[in-house]
From Swiss-Prot:
HAMAP family: Ribosomal_uL14. SMART domains: Ribosomal_L14. This is Large ribosomal subunit protein uL14. GO terms for molecular function: large ribosomal subunit rRNA binding; structural constituent of ribosome. One of its GO terms (cellular component) is cytosolic large ribosomal subunit. The keyword rRNA-binding applies. Signal peptide: none annotated. Belongs to the universal ribosomal protein uL14 family. GO terms for biological process: translation. Part of the 50S ribosomal subunit. Forms a cluster with proteins L3 and L19. In the 70S ribosome, L14 and L19 interact and together make contacts with the 16S rRNA in bridges B5 and B8. It holds the Pfam family Ribosomal_L14.
Amino acid sequence: MIQEQTMLDVADNSGARSVMCIKVLGGSHRRYAAIGDIIKVTVKEAIPRGKVKKGDVLKAVVVRTKKGVRRPDGSVIRFDGNACVILNNNTEQPIGTRIFGPVTRELRSEKFMKIISLAPEVL
């Protein structure tokens, strides 16, 4: 469960290291985002010569949460931290060309097949 002011790690090579959620998209009073939801983030820590810089406001998709995701068979997949992948503000496609760490099968929609194909492991 990601809400405003939540700090997330970045699971791609866009140049951002950590970001902060500033808005959960999809409804005027929506409070929480789960895996697969799009959020608005600001870059808090970035590496030199990256594609994004500190202070940039971008869209991101949540790929891992400590809360986890419940499957129809009753199992729950949880992670050690919260992570997201930075998206292009217009096309909503990933800015980075590599994804680090596992992602869940819940991202397997038309919009995020690129993330699934780049990920080293799909749980």
